């Protein structure tokens, strides 16, 4: 299905927290990044891509871990996540996955994983 409206406005609580972190640290990012050669029935999107660091970020809500909707989407979600993991590895792109239970730790996770990469580059 085609995404409607402003993707940032439609983002989740976890995604909003990540957006705030990236903006607070003036880290340029692409929201809802897609690669033309990454598909499963349709295009797959990563939540965030930071070109400068060649890093993707995925915030994984509960539906990535539990069959919440009971409509077959859980199995599809598992397949999509695995394809995204493999794509990142095969293209030498760092992928940071943040599970929903780490919502309160988003800032510390990103500080550790992103800011250390920025320091390495300088």
Show the residue positions of the predicted features.
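Nucleic-acid endo/exonuclease domains
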Residues: 1-122
């Amino acid at each position: 299905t085609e995404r409607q409206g402003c993707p940032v406005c439609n983002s989740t609580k976890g995604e909003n927290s990540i957006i705030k972190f990236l903006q607070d640290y003036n880290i340029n990012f692409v929201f809802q990044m897609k690669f033309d050669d990454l598909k499963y029935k349709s295009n797959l999107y990563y939540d965030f891509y930071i070109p400068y660091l060649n890093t993707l970020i995925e915030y994984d809500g509960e539906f990535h871990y539990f069959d919440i909707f009971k409509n077959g989407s859980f199995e599809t979600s598992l397949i999509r996540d695995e394809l995204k993991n493999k794509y990142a590895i095969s293209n030498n792109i760092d992928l940071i996955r943040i599970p929903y239970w780490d919502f309160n730790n988003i800032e510390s996770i990103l500080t550790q994983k992103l800011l250390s990469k920025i320091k390495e580059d300088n």
